Amino acid sequence: MPFIFSFMMSALLYSVSYVCLAENISSITPYSSIKAPLANQSLLLDITAVGHHKLIAVGQYGHIIMSADGESWHQSNVPVQSTLTKVYFYNENLGWAVGHDATILHSQDGGVSWAIQLFKPRLEKPFFDIVFKTPLEGIAVGAKGLFYRTIDGGATWNKEYHSEFISPENLLHLSKLKRKDEDAFLDEHSSLSPHFNHLMLDGRTLYLVGEHGLISKSNDFGINWTLLEHIYKGSFYDIIRTLKSKLLVVGLHGHVFRSSKSGTSWTKPDTNTVALINDIVLTDDGRIFLLAADGVLLESNDDGQSYRLKKQTDGKALISGIWFNGQLIVASETGVKIVPL
């Protein structure tokens, strides 16, 4: 059953969240990313398709690269050198990229050019994911409870503090601190919050997974959250819904969990690996690939019930992937790869 904090404990910290307005641009001036001939061979942390004819990948040094086929790449102009961890496109024109230094970038031309919406290096926290419900309503999440929301397409971003993700004993501690020192309360709230690693918008339901076995869902786009059954103490890094409407969540030490009841009960398929699993890729024909550290690639042909190991010979981490024009194209620690299957 979902784990829900008692009304009394939640009320101590406003049962939904504490929200404060944040400045979008830091007083620190960022340096623009440098054009690098081998950017497609450097550390890349995410890759996505923009429509049916374009790929975009992001990674270290603010690199954003684009391709029409997964083989030939060119680099976009980017106004930061911060490592970028995630790229998301709402449609073929509107996109966002997030990363270190609490950076949020926005593109209105399909990724050709980018502008800064948020840059706060003094926070010393990275964003790990971003998703938009409409062209105006979006959420970005990251390390130690980092959670920002926009309702105007990113012209302004508001920071939120969510008490649902903090244990009851720590909620009591925070409630006492809040009465004494507001600034100390906000700092402590962040330090006690888990890392938020990945968001998935599944129809009207928004899922969030992260540190300490966090699996949570929201039916109002992240205003209120319900914690699902605690099935694992380690971190989760991705969650998807399969073509047969099952939930899959993956994380540390080769852990995979599968639910046929939208998270109310779970089974644990055997993966025969202890590698950290970074990403889940679905193909058009229903196959599932899990991308992991140490060159580990897992394939399932039965909707995630069992897996076959297909380890890559170079042993390099497979970090993010996309099924594009019948090929598995992966962002890795050594750049973009088209993985032979």
Segments (PLM) and residue ranges:
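N-terminal signal peptide c-region/cleavage motif recognized by signal peptidases
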Residues: 15-17
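Bacterial N-terminal signal peptides that target proteins for export
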Residues: 1-8
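Residue-level hotspots at or immediately adjacent to binding/recognition sites across diverse folds
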Residues: 21-341
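Cleavable N-terminal signal peptides
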Residues: 10, 19-20
